[in-house]
């Protein structure tokens, strides 16, 4: 095992043993290759560099309480990558190839898989890019699929420390009938200006509204939105939201725990009725939110604040959902949904 302080990894890049690559050319995928160098060589005219012809995924592998290694729902990531690739008109790996490369990259980098109990995991970043040289705006005919990995700590340090968020009314993450529901790098680029501005103002995340009317909640800059009221788990229904696998899993767990699940448009004004609010995604599972500020513009001094629970700790129902997901991932509790692939 690598000589690392597993409890202080943070969420960032760290060199591992190998990355995996697989090229698509002449209508077929080639062999999967291991590379010890995580630099790649592509044409300066590659479509990915000029027209953002790329999509990616994020998932995790965990070393369990029983010593087994588990991948959490890689089949869902494979399907979502295929959906993103189809939208930008490029070839996508089959679900079988996707999962094969997930398993292989974990095995080749097993020394970097954090131990059980460290609140850390191995983050996998499947990445698909268009690589053939081109000048015109068109879908790529040649692609490179890469399976990358890195050991990571919890995105927010593993403390479930509630966050301070602002609503963006003057900037949108996505466009109506646009790419918001696909996992494309360009969507994240679109959120950087408003996120950087909000960060300078002391906020930890940005909550975006529907881009057509700015009346309904969409999602955060890098994660989905959920809320809890009474015994209901509530999350937005919108065509401009990325379909989060974590959110989908939380909905299933909520039902298992006897909660009512509501996926529907969520008006901004409804924030005042929620007991708990959180961000959810692969990197965090759940980050509770203790305050959301609504402003006419990000830099406006006029503020309508909404408060949820404690500034110091996660709400009880969010915590219960979090513990069940993490328990399944770590092999501490039974996986009744057959979500995990055990290596």
Question: What is the predicted role of each segment?
Answer:
Residues 1-36:
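Short, Gly/Pro- and small/polar-rich lid/capping loops
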Residues 5, 77, 82, 88-201, ...:
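Extended Lys/Arg-rich, glycine-bearing segments that form polyanion-binding/interaction patches
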Residues 17-19, 56, 142-144, 162-163, ...:
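Short glycine-rich loop/turn motifs
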Residues 21-29, 55, 62-67, 74, ...:
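Short acidic-glycine loop/turn motifs at beta-strand connectors
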Residues 94-96, 112-121, 206-209, 260-267, ...:
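Flexible, glycine/charged-enriched surface loops at secondary-structure junctions
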